[in-house]
From Swiss-Prot:
Top enzyme category: transferase
Name of the protein this chain belongs to: Phosphoribulokinase, chloroplastic
UniProt cross-references to NCBIfam families, sorted A to Z: PRK07429.1
GO annotation, cellular component aspect: chloroplast; cytoplasm
EC number(s) recorded for this UniProt protein: 2.7.1.19
Source organism (scientific name): Spinacia oleracea (Spinach)
Membrane recorded as keyword: no
Amino acid sequence: MAVCTVYTIPTTTHLGSSFNQNNKQVFFNYKRSSSSNNTLFTTRPSYVITCSQQQTIVIGLAADSGCGKSTFMRRLTSVFGGAAEPPKGGNPDSNTLISDTTTVICLDDFHSLDRNGRKVEKVTALDPKANDFDLMYEQVKALKEGKAVDKPIYNHVSGLLDPPELIQPPKILVIEGLHPMYDARVRELLDFSIYLDISNEVKFAWKIQRDMKERGHSLESIKASIESRKPDFDAYIDPQKQHADVVIEVLPTELIPDDDEGKVLRVRMIQKEGVKFFNPVYLFDEGSTISWIPCGRKLTCSYPGIKFSYGPDTFYGNEVTVVEMDGMFDRLDELIYVESHLSNLSTKFYGEVTQQMLKHQNFPGSNNGTGFFQTIIGLKIRDLFEQLVASRSTATATAAKA
């Protein structure tokens, strides 16, 4: 769908690089007759019409820090083909990932306070006061309309706000971070939304692994960070899941009594009913309530085994469909047996979920429900993207005939 905007020439200077390869510009002069004998008129200021050739589709992914957003993004961008990489020639500490089809923006880049500023103001990064939602809304809206933006960068290494980077409008924009569904204006821009809901026990184990290994934080600082963030998480982050189209809930297993290691996970994919262009995945018989232990001749299962559940439910007053997996896969090549019993996967061919899982078998969560459901949601987003593009093309063609 083409999106057109009219500017006077004097006002276009502040747009900088917003005219890009996705835009077409038409220049013209505003003219007015200067006499009754139709003598040609005085030339007025020139104008430019900018028409984007596409409207970017926007996906929102919300979760607390250290909850697997980065891995999810790698799985998602892989579904569309091409590796997601930082902007070439840009800031080496950029949080942005770009592939042929997708651009992933980390919403930490819209922090209004750097690390020291938050200490001075005694607020966490989760507090809305530490974030610039006006700028977030303006830039996501601009990208959705096909305009490039100079997006700020929050440097996770130094804790400082770095100079901005140029972001061109992609086919699919993913905004991931703490607050993609917090501000109602930003929420309205989303075509689809996901919330990663990690239990406190699992979150602690994941955050230790990431922040100690990748960011060099001490165990004591991680514990202090979790405790200091919890009130703000409960107030500002957790409530966003009521707005999500899909919630991936990660819990300790129920297969091992009193398990406290957190190595085996129970993962629930909570899918909201009635979402346009999204048909919930189901197991065996749509609308039924099912419990299934697939271990046997076709699926190798070591202790404690694998259990699937499926059925309708309600979530924050919304009708939902829930698919649950508890346990771990021993052999990913056998996953196709499970895949064959699930419907509405939005695959292009038989075994595509299994192929994607095998392709990224070294990613965290590849042997449990986190990687399995993330892969499925990636395929569902691809299908949603294709349906949205087709519907907009149809609407444009219909409007042209009118």
